[in-house]
């Protein structure tokens, strides 16, 4: 039997989190397409250009915006949290691609995980910090 040459594409993985959103990101050599949960990025993010611009940010910093396709599996949270999670995942995948990508991405703040999350509700209060109305008499 004749051996067939299998040219596998090299895939780079990165995981991003923001609020309660988690995004598992794959960078595959391609033309700059963004696919989120098997849908084109502009349809998934309701054609909101700010989200797509944020996702492409790490690639634009390195001048690679048309060299890799971004394949994403995102769940949890809302669109803003998912977009920021994807951005962090892309940046981490680019660090896996080449270690010399790390300093420019870190300088731009793409490798920093935003720690802000919803504060839990406390008993005796209406919300996390909103107290019931105080009556002096």
UniProtKB/Swiss-Prot annotation:
Listed InterPro entries: Ribosomal_Su5_D2-typ_SF, Ribosomal_uS9, Ribosomal_uS9_bac/plastid, Ribosomal_uS9_CS, Ribsml_uS5_D2-typ_fold_subgr
Pfam families linked: Ribosomal_S9 (PF00380)
Membrane-crossing segments per the record: none
SUPFAM superfamilies according to UniProt: Ribosomal protein S5 domain 2-like
Alphabetical list of Gene3D superfamilies matching this protein: 3.30.230.10
Domain of life: Bacteria
Biological process, per Gene Ontology: translation
UniProt-annotated stretches for the region Disordered: 103-137
GO CC terms: cytosolic small ribosomal subunit
Residue stretches of biased makeup (Basic residues): 118-137
Gene Ontology molecular function: RNA binding; structural constituent of ribosome
Keyword Nucleotidyltransferase in record: no
UniProt KW keywords: Ribonucleoprotein, Ribosomal protein
Family: Belongs to the universal ribosomal protein uS9 family.
Protein name: Small ribosomal subunit protein uS9
Organism for this UniProt entry: Crocosphaera subtropica (strain ATCC 51142 / BH68) (Cyanothece sp. (strain ATCC 51142))
Lineage, uppermost ranks: Bacteria, Bacillati, Cyanobacteriota, Cyanophyceae, Oscillatoriophycideae
């Amino acid at each position: 039997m004749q051996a067939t040459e299998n040219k596998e594409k090299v895939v780079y993985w990165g995981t991003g989190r923001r609020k309660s959103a988690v995004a598992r990101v794959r960078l595959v050599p391609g033309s700059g397409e963004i696919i989120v949960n098997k849908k084109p990025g502009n349809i998934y993010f309701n054609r909101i250009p700010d989200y797509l611009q944020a996702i492409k940010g790490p690639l634009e910093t390195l001048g690679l915006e048309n060299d890799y396709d971004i394949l994403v599996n995102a769940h949890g949270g809302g669109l803003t949290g998912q977009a920021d999670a994807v951005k962090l995942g892309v940046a981490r995948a680019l660090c896996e691609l080449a270690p010399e990508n790390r300093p420019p991405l870190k300088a731009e703040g793409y490798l920093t995980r935003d720690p802000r999350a919803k504060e839990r509700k406390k008993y005796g209060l209406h919300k996390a910090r909103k107290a019931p109305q105080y009556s002096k008499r």
